[in-house]
A protein has these predicted regions:
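A short helix-loop
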Residues: 1-33, 136-139
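Short, mixed-charge aromatic SLiMs
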Residues: 13-23, 95, 142-154
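Acidic, glycine/GT-rich loop-and beta-edge segments that sit at the periphery of enzyme/chaperone cores
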Residues: 1-6, 130-175
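Activation-segment/catalytic-loop signature of the eukaryotic protein kinase fold
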Residues: 16-113
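A broad structural signal for alpha-helix termini and local helix breaks/kinks
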Residues: 1-2, 79, 104, 129
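Glycine-rich phosphate-binding/hydrolytic loop that grips phosphoryl groups
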Residues: 58, 62, 98, 112-141
Length: 175
C-alpha cells in the first residue's frame, strides 16, 4: 500500500520518474537569510493532492540543490571549471547527483570513496606530520577515482527557468 515503507533504491527510482518541480512543487529546506523579518521552518510549497511521497522526495533533493546554487550566486562563488564535488549521503543517490548537475549546470564529481571524512582526516594527519605541504597536495597524492555526472542540457534549461520561481516562493515565505 502507499503507506508502506520503501527502500532507498525504490525511493530514488520512483522520484526519478517524477517531473522536475512537478507542477510548481518546491521544498524549502530552511530559511534564514539577510533581510528576512523572521525565521521559518522547512516547508513544501505548491503541494496538492496529486503529489505523493516520491514527488516530495524529489522536491527535497531539488530544494536543497536550489538553495546551494542560490548561496553560490549570493556569495558570487565561482566553482572550478572541473565542476562540483559531491560527497556524503547525497552522493549515494544517482538521481540526486544528476539533479545537482542539472540545477547547477556544472559537471558533478563523485569520489569513489564512501566516507570522505576519513580520507580528510588522513590527509590532515599527513599535513600535520609534514608528509604533505597542504591538503590539496594530499588529495592529489591519494588520486581518488571519481565518476563524473554531466548536466543534461534540456533539464538544466528547465531548472534555470524554475530557479526564479523557487526564489520568489522562498522570499514570499519570509514576508
Amino acid at each position: 500500500s502507499d503507506g508502506e515503507p520503501v527502500g532507498y533504491e525504490t525511493l530514488n527510482r520512483e522520484a526519478a520518474s517524477r517531473r522536475a518541480a512537478d507542477d510548481g512543487l518546491f521544498f524549502v529546506p530552511f530559511q534564514g537569510y539577510a533581510g528576512q523579518k523572521r525565521f521559518s521552518k522547512a516547508s513544501f510549497i505548491g503541494m496538492d493532492l496529486s503529489h505523493d511521497r516520491f514527488h516530495m522526495a524529489r522536491a527535497i533533493m531539488e530544494g536543497i540543490v536550489f538553495q546551494v546554487v542560490w548561496m553560490m550566486e549570493a556569495f558570487r562563488s565561482k566553482p572550478s571549471s572541473d565542476g562540483l564535488k559531491l560527497a556524503g549521503g547525497a552522493s549515494k543517490s544517482p538521481l540526486w547527483c544528476q539533479i545537482t548537475a542539472d540545477i547547477s549546470g556544472l559537471p558533478v564529481r563523485v569520489p569513489a570513496v564512501a566516507d570522505l571524512a576519513c580520507v580528510g582526516a588522513a590527509i590532515l594527519a599527513g599535513v600535520g606530520t609534514g608528509i604533505y605541504q597542504n591538503a590539496e597536495e594530499g588529495y592529489k597524492h591519494l588520486a581518488i577515482d571519481e565518476r563524473v555526472i554531466m548536466p543534461d542540457p534540456e533539464r538544466s534549461a528547465e531548472y534555470r527557468r524554475l530557479l526564479p520561481a523557487y526564489k520568489r516562493s522562498v522570499q514570499a515565505l519570509g514576508d
